[in-house]
From Swiss-Prot:
Homodimer. Heterotetramer of two MnmE and two MnmG subunits. It holds the Pfam family GIDA. It is found in: Cytoplasm. The keyword DNA-binding does not apply. FAD binds at residues 14-19, 126, 181, 370. Keywords: Cytoplasm, FAD, Flavoprotein, NAD, tRNA processing. Belongs to the MnmG family. GO terms for molecular function: flavin adenine dinucleotide binding. NAD-binding protein involved in the addition of a carboxymethylaminomethyl (cmnm) group at the wobble position (U34) of certain tRNAs, forming tRNA-cmnm(5)s(2)U34. This is tRNA uridine 5-carboxymethylaminomethyl modification enzyme MnmG. It comes from the Bacteria.
Length: 628
């Protein structure tokens, strides 16, 4: 084994969506960073759907951007259809989604990585960690090179012992066309980490020239398209539509006829699949009364005929795939360019991580992405930027960045993972966040820009832009509170026409906006200053005013829980010796080893009474250490 003659501060293993954000974060913070990947031509490759964002996932992308990450800027530069989802619902659950030109997305991210100072890209398969006792010191590659590093971030995706299934045929692979990673997960087991098995899948890729789009429902994007990044002024890529197709009873009969050759139902696949993204055979079996299922036919790019049938993932044999796709209206002559497949892979139970995403068993080793049991590019990227930041902070000897549940969806996700663990692929939903009215897409920069600037990921220009926006929001709120309607003839006629004749002279614009039937657009009809206010400021101000009571209530809940969240628990706490805790609670606390009292309170089975006992024991523990 040859030892490379350079010691890195941070080594990132894997160049998917988690690895790219981790490597960029560390390098931008001034760390000498190495990004290792099995295939340099597959950096940031969209292995499944060619899209970014969606319900709750869009929130994650906005948060990554606010922290100084790259995903939002990358999709803004390569997106070919943008939509805001849930526009008829409240602001807490509105979400951005964009179709990507799959190849342009990959190529742009690779170019960003290549042009980043302090970042080295190398192709190589990591087969083992190089450890000194319980401290990681570097990585070993199949080509016989040992790279030394102060910290290591593992972002292995679906590659650890990856096994691809198409019907009863199966073969090793990290994804179609790429080799798996063999040996690394076995070593992680030997190091004391609990390794499990999960499964995911992807649909076939269809030849768009063989689809009759005139018989499908077109779905157009928003006009004008709204960017993800707070730094993007406008979208310049050509925009294209998607289309909607449906299965039918004949499709379902074909699928049922192939279940005996489905690895999912033949008992061949051991791993647990994603609950919220089931395969088409799973949908047909679980919902026998449903006479059709929707499929979104999504283009994979502007310069390709490949189409992605979203909602149609499967591991059925290829003859069944061809038959059921061709049973759908508009797809009768469709040709499959790449078959659908399922894939099993190893993951490491995230309950074994600190809030910083550092493993508890191995010092200086961080995990991010699907290795932690999550699904989705956005979930991976959110973990990646946090792991990269914390690996960099470790090399500086600084305290880790901990994002709380009350300030970000990334914080909710990490807390869920390290507190509850997961036995199935985890995906983010707005319902997982108890403070979701505070964690909106539109205010991600107001929540996280300061943090990104403090750690060194947000540029001076971006930070100044954030400060200008923040000050404009505050100034506009003050103006609306101070400006009152005079009930001029124009105002009186407008309010009467809107069915509001009871308005009194002297009512402030702020009081006016609190009414559910009045929007900021109404102010534009008679207030010239409002017409000059930027739309992003108008949006923030209107939400803050209309939901002020609910927002204040959630802020009060956060203040009440702050003491628990800010009380750390010692790593050497002997929970088994604490009198007053049940055996069940002692076992759960010993297994999870929570970082704070707040985290302990969210472990299933740990009651408020147990938290009180734990708080008393913590004070006694602190007193004993002082005397010692």
């Amino acid at each position: 084994m040859m030892t490379y003659d350079f010691e890195y501060d941070v080594i990132v293993v894997g160049a998917g969506h988690a690895g790219c954000e981790a490597a960029l974060a560390a390098a931008r913070m001034g760390c000498r960073t190495l990004l290792l990947t099995i295939n340099l031509d597959a950096i940031a490759l969209m292995s499944c759907n060619p899209s970014i964002g969606g319900l709750a996932k869009g929130h994650l992308v906005k948060e990554i951007d606010a922290l100084g990450g790259e995903m939002a800027r990358n999709i803004d530069a390569t997106g070919i259809q943008f939509r805001i989802l849930n526009t008829r619902k409240g602001p807490a659950v509105r979400a951005s989604r964009a179709q990507a030109d799959k190849q342009l997305y990959r190529l742009r991210m690779k170019r960003v990585l290549e042009n980043q100072d302090n970042l080295h890209l190398k192709q190589g398969e990591v087969t083992a960690l190089y450890c000194d006792g319980s401290v990681v010191r570097g990585v070993d590659t199949r080509s016989g090179i040992r790279f030394l590093g102060k910290t290591v971030v593992l972002t292995t995706g679906t590659f650890m012992r990856g096994l691809i299934h198409i019907g009863l045929t199966h073969y090793e692979g990290g994804r179609a066309g790429d080799l798996p990673s063999i040996g690394l997960s076995d070593q992680l087991k030997q190091l004391g980490l609990q390794v499990g098995r999960l499964k995911t899948g992807t649909p076939a890729r269809l030849d768009g020239r063989t689809i009759d789009f005139s018989r499908l429902e077109p779905q157009h994007g928003d006009n004008p398209p709204q960017p993800f990044s707070f730094s993007t002024e406008r979208i310049t890529m050509r925009q294209v539509p998607c289309h909607i197709a449906y299965t039918n009873e004949r499709s379902h009969d074909i699928i049922r006829s192939g279940l005996d050759r489905s690895p999912l139902y033949a008992g061949i696949i051991e791993g647990i699949g994603p609950r919220y993204c089931p395969s088409i055979e799973d949908k047909v079996v679980r919902f026998p009364d449903k006479d059709r299922h929707q499929a979104f036919i999504e283009p994979e790019g502007l310069d390709t005929v490949e189409m992605y049938p979203s909602g149609m993932s499967t591991s059925l044999p290829i003859d069944i795939q061809i038959a059921f796709y061709r049973s759908m209206e508009g797809l009768e002559r469709v040709e499959i360019m790449r078959p659908a497949y399922g894939i099993e892979y190893d993951y490491v139970d995230p309950i074994q991580l600190h809030t910083s995403l550092e493993t508890k068993a191995i010092t200086n080793l961080y995990h991010a992405g699907q290795i932690n049991g999550t699904s989705g590019y956005e979930e991976a990227a959110g973990q990646g930027i946090v792991a990269g930041i914390n690996a960099a902070l470790r090399t500086r000897g600084e305290e880790p960045l901990i994002l709380s549940r009350s300030e970000s969806y990334i914080g909710v996700m990490i807390d869920d993972l390290i507190t509850l663990g997961t036995k199935e692929p985890y995906r983010m939903f707005t319902s997982r966040a108890e403070y979701r009215l505070l964690l909106r897409e539109d205010n991600a920069d107001q929540r996280l820009r300061e943090i990104g600037y403090r750690v060194g990921l947000v540029s001076d220009a971006e930070y100044e832009g954030y400060l200008r926006k923040r000050d404009m929001i505050q100034a506009e709120r003050e103006r609306l509170a101070a400006t009152r309607i005079s009930m001029s003839q124009a105002e009186e006629e407008y309010f009467t026409a809107r069915g509001l004749p009871d308005l009194q002279k002297g009512t402030s614009y702020e009081q006016l906006l609190r009414r559910p039937e009045i929007t900021y657009d109404d102010l534009l009809s008679f207030d010239t200053v409002s017409r000059e206010t930027p739309s992003v400021v108008r949006e923030q101000v209107e939400i803050q005013i209309k939901y002020q009571g609910y927002i204040e209530r959630q802020l009060e809940q956060i203040r009440r829980s702050a003491k628990l969240e800010n009380t750390p628990l010692p790593t050497d706490m002997d929970y088994a010796a604490i009198n007053g805790l049940t055996t069940e609670v002692k076992e759960k606390l010993t297994k999870v080893r929570p970082d704070t009292l707040g985290q302990a309170s969210r472990i299933p089975g740990v009651t408020p009474a147990a938290v009180s006992v734990l708080s008393i024991a913590l004070k006694a523990h602190a007193g004993a250490r002082k005397q010692g």
